[in-house]
Regions:
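Amphipathic alpha-helical polymerization modules
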Residues: 1-237
């Protein structure tokens, strides 16, 4: 079998992976705080005893685009936006701590604050609020609750968001969309980040996704054309 088939097959496989990444980005074009996933391709010459006439393809520049998204004013008390390099701490499915830029906080049926189903972590663990209470979030992340029918001067703090600071190179996205510390960062900063008291949030504001839907659609079309070309190479060899 001609080695060109393997070359084209490898390129087609990587193109499919690139299409999957682009499709995921498009699907999250309206997800608050979403960071577009990067996936580029690069040539890898085949080295060996044969002539240097074969070049394979592999993925490069994995990671996420940390460019901030635009701010949308929602006036919803439980929506918060953070400064650049600021993150909200959440509890992942395995109980470990993860980080997100998605500030769309929800209240589940048990009164626990969640983001995309993940419990929001405060400085003393997951945060719960009284049922039916009016919730406000201060700039420093302090969450206060006013029970129905109570006078305004009885507002009481129920917790404080754990706000942490990390650069894009210090975190890695998981399959669940939540970011976690890289191994290198854990070696220098510990298994979890400490709360940063200097960080501030804007209540009633959401950071939008940084996905450029038009550019992503163009990338999807270009990937489809590359895949079609690679299939023609395979069928003609």
């Amino acid at each position: 079998m001609d080695h060109a088939i393997y070359t084209a097959m490898g390129a087609a496989s990587q193109t499919l992976n690139q299409q999957a990444v682009t499709a995921s980005n498009l699907a999250n074009a309206s997800t608050p705080g979403f960071r577009a996933q990067l996936n580029a391709l690069r040539a890898v010459p085949v080295e060996g005893l044969s002539l240097p006439t074969r070049t394979l393809v592999t993925a490069s520049t994995p990671g996420a685009d940390m460019t901030p998204g635009k701010m949308d004013y929602t006036s919803r008390p439980l929506d918060v936006a953070l400064q650049q390099d600021g993150w909200l701490a959440v509890q992942t499915a395995d109980g470990s701590e993860g980080y997100t830029r998605n500030g769309s906080i929800q209240v589940d049926p048990t009164g626990q604050l969640t983001i995309q189903g993940h419990p929001v972590i405060g400085e003393a663990g997951p945060i719960a609020v009284p049922e039916g209470a009016e919730i406000t979030i201060a700039a420093d992340g302090t969450i206060s609750a006013l029970n129905p029918g109570d006078p305004a001067n009885t507002v009481a703090p129920v917790g404080r968001l754990k706000l942490v600071k990390a650069t894009g190179s210090e975190v890695q996205r998981g399959d669940d969309g939540i970011f976690r510390l890289s191994a290198e960062t854990q070696a220098t900063r510990g298994p979890v980040l400490q709360a940063d008291p200097t960080l501030r949030v804007m209540s009633g504001v959401l950071e939008g996704s940084n996905v450029n839907a038009v550019a992503a659609m163009s990338d999807m079309i270009a990937s489809a054309r590359r895949f079609e070309m690679q299939m023609k190479v395979i069928s003609s060899v």
